Amino acid sequence: MVFVNPLANALTSIYNNEMRRNKQAIIMPASKLVINVLRVMQKEGYVGEFEYIDDGRWGKITVQLLGRVNKCGPITPRYPLSYRQMIALPDYIRRYLPSKEIGIIIVSTSKGVMSHKEAARMRLGGVALGYVY
């Protein structure tokens, strides 16, 4: 089995399990980036608790789903965002979110992975990784 983009696999797995009304999703392979993205989603209230399981190969993450994700997915190619672009809400953010009050763009910054709203508050730029609403 080939895993080209672990973040895309994780977000697709969460979305598919939410659409099937499952209470739990198993994500593999696990990575630090996926764990940090899950922390942002947990902080924003989209997923519940998650746990890393070391299986001796890639590792797995079990995520408790709350039924609050309508759509999530990766943003490819990964667009660089400046601080001013996060405030101005450019076209590609409008493309991924239904409105500027609903949903988040997950951004990787120099201070770590966070939502685009938090990055704009901290006046940071970064790279857009994915979206959730």
UniProtKB/Swiss-Prot annotation:
What is a single molecular function from GO for this protein?
rRNA binding
What keyword terms does UniProt attach to this protein?
A: Ribonucleoprotein, Ribosomal protein, RNA-binding, rRNA-binding
The source organism is: Saccharolobus islandicus (strain L.S.2.15 / Lassen #1)
Q: What is this protein called?
A: Small ribosomal subunit protein uS8
Q: Does the keyword RNA-binding apply?
A: yes
Task: State the encoding gene.
Answer: rps8
GO terms classed as biological process: translation
Xref: InterPro entries: Ribosomal_uS8, Ribosomal_uS8_CS, Ribosomal_uS8_sf
Q: What does this protein do?
A: One of the primary rRNA binding proteins, it binds directly to 16S rRNA central domain where it helps coordinate assembly of the platform of the 30S subunit.
Is this entry keyworded Iron-sulfur? no
Q: Which family does it belong to?
A: Belongs to the universal ribosomal protein uS8 family.
Naming one, the record's GO cellular component terms include: ribonucleoprotein complex
Q: How does the annotation summarize its subunit structure?
A: Part of the 30S ribosomal subunit.
